[in-house]
């Protein structure tokens, strides 16, 4: 499960990077693409940090950061929806769906981690 989640987070960050290359080039899409690349890669990188957590509290904190970054990514995707060219619709749909699934997984993980204190 750990490697699968890591792979999904890395894949999401890579697909978002590809998506950002296909945006319309407007000021807002340029601005948001930089932000969404940061938030999606942060989620993947923080997953590695969570795997090396020093305590249950540290793990819970790091997983909470992953969830926050994924939620930020979700909102950025919504804001970018008008800037997506026709050739990027599939990438946008994949990123939206995958991000929603990962938010649900990490939301449950945070709840479980907090209840196991």
Residue ranges and their predicted role:
Residues 1-45, 49, 53-117:
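Short, C-terminally biased terminal segments at protein or domain edges
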